[in-house]
């Protein structure tokens, strides 16, 4: 475990990075914690790295990054993971999914952290899933997977409509004798029966701007 002097160095690096956007010099660190020898400061920094509290890039001068372990040692909340918002999907009849390079992200909810790295977010258009609280304009967290159990809420892609290009929808999934049933959660809408379907992922969470 790092000594008190080392934690003081770690805290000074953190504060200066937040203040200026880059880490302090070794001399500045020494002055801040009462060490006149730069070699002694280097020794403390090396031990902080050995403890996993910070990381140095040997190819760049003054390139120091405080790790999540280091932030915890300072009592700083960890940076939450982020999930990319990659496009639009319908909660109605299947439409061509609008996909894009992610430029927007949502923080990963704590109850979905176990799926970190396997999630994406889609905006929902339509009202076919309102009985289970997925409304027009909501965003759904989707865990990437290419399979589903009967009754799962999924993002499904089918080529049975339009010009044969893949079209996506959010529905409850059922595999039946000679077809797949994509079941809406809206009493006014009929199920969608298709022969060809690909599962893009399972819906595991919901985001709504008005209440989140």
From Swiss-Prot:
Record-stated family: Belongs to the peptidase S24 family.
Gene3D superfamilies linked to this entry: Umud Fragment, subunit A, Winged helix-like DNA-binding domain superfamily/Winged helix DNA-binding domain
Descriptive protein name: LexA repressor
Site (Cleavage): residue numbering on this chain: 91-92
Database matches in InterPro entries: ArsR-like_HTH, LexA, LexA-like, LexA/Signal_pep-like_sf, LexA_DNA-bd_dom, LexA_repressor, Peptidase_S24_LexA, Peptidase_S24_S26A/B/C
Record's catalysed reaction(s): Hydrolysis of Ala-|-Gly bond in repressor LexA
UniProt keywords, alphabetically: Autocatalytic cleavage, DNA damage, DNA repair, DNA replication, DNA-binding, Hydrolase, Repressor, SOS response, Transcription, Transcription regulation
Originating organism: Oenococcus oeni (strain ATCC BAA-331 / PSU-1)
Function field: Represses a number of genes involved in the response to DNA damage (SOS response), including recA and lexA. In the presence of single-stranded DNA, RecA interacts with LexA causing an autocatalytic cleavage which disrupts the DNA-binding part of LexA, leading to derepression of the SOS regulon and eventually DNA repair.
EC code: 3.4.21.88
DNA-binding region range list: 26-46
